[in-house]
Amino acid sequence: MKTLLLTLVLVTIMCLDLGYTIRCFITPDVTSTDCPNGHVCYTKTWCDGFCSSRGRRVELGCAATCPTVKPGVDIQCCSTDNCNPFPTRP
């Protein structure tokens, strides 16, 4: 009887939606942070006045949907844990 009860408890726990949250890197600290359920991670890059000497500006974050950006701004969105690491310079 105890085995049956334990099995039912385990199956119930496995079948419940436990409110999975995604982990995304967030700037300025580039730390991995829990984001709300259903959000996506993003990496946004663009050039400013110092692009030739410092490289592209980078913003990492999470949002309910992939953000809309202006022309000249690149964005990549993803939906797995820590899928938006700080880009390496070529």
Swiss-Prot record:
Transmembrane segments: none
Keywords for the protein's UniProt record, in alphabetical order: Acetylcholine receptor inhibiting toxin, Disulfide bond, Ion channel impairing toxin, Neurotoxin, Postsynaptic neurotoxin, Secreted, Signal, Toxin
Record's subcellular location: Secreted
A GO CC term attached to the entry: extracellular region
Presence of the UniProt keyword Lipid biosynthesis in the record: no
Residues spanning the signal sequence: 1-21
InterPro entries: Snake_3FTx, Snake_toxin-like_sf, Snake_toxin_con_site, Toxin_cobra-type
Tissues with expression: Expressed by the venom gland.
GO molecular function, one term: toxin activity
Disulfide cross-links: C24-C41, C35-C62, C47-C51, C66-C77, C78-C83
A Pfam family: Toxin_cobra-type
Function: Binds with high affinity to muscular (alpha-1/CHRNA1) and neuronal (alpha-7/CHRNA7) nicotinic acetylcholine receptor (nAChR) and inhibits acetylcholine from binding to the receptor, thereby impairing neuromuscular and neuronal transmission.
Family: Belongs to the three-finger toxin family. Long-chain subfamily. Type II alpha-neurotoxin sub-subfamily.
Name of this chain's protein: Long neurotoxin 7
Origin species: Naja sputatrix (Malayan spitting cobra)
